[in-house]
Amino acid sequence: MLKQEVTSLKNYQIQCPYCGAKAVLRSANKVFGAKTREANRFLYVCSNWPSCDSYVMAHMEDHRPMGTMANGMLRHKRILAHKALQAYRKATHTDKWASYIWLEGKLGLDQQRTHIGMFSDEECDRVIALCRKEIAISKQNRMRGVS
């Protein structure tokens, strides 16, 4: 039944930015193993996987890619950028929506492009640096009693 559901959804044509091979939609179990918390999810995986370790998670409802394909180093950098943005939200008491609007302005990107899953290594570095700077300013303001 699951196979029928997968084939009935739109098929996205994605090419690996690292080796140029076609990406294929696979169960997360095939990449992460059966005991993953992503067990019911799907990924677009480079057809040269595992020698090319590029993949991107797919949305559950329609299997749209959640960003661009990334190798292990870029996926790690995106995780760090997400963590930095979460720390920024916590330090500045900002909700997720407002933090992305802030990020749009800081990066000079539009709403469609302001998703960490679409960011390059350099953009992730900028997010991390911007968040650290704002967290430091917020901390200084709290210490001085400025809100």
Question: Whereabouts are the PLM-identified features?
Answer:
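Extended interfacial segments that mediate partner engagement and assembly in macromolecular machines
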Residues: 61-97
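Non-catalytic, well-ordered alpha-helical scaffold segments
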Residues: 40, 97-101, 125
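N-terminal cysteine/histidine-rich coordination modules
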Residues: 1-61
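Amphipathic protein-protein interaction modules
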Residues: 84-85, 91-115
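Long C-terminal interaction/binding lobes of large macromolecular proteins
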Residues: 132-147
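Chromatin/DNA-recognition segments of nuclear transcriptional regulators
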Residues: 113-133
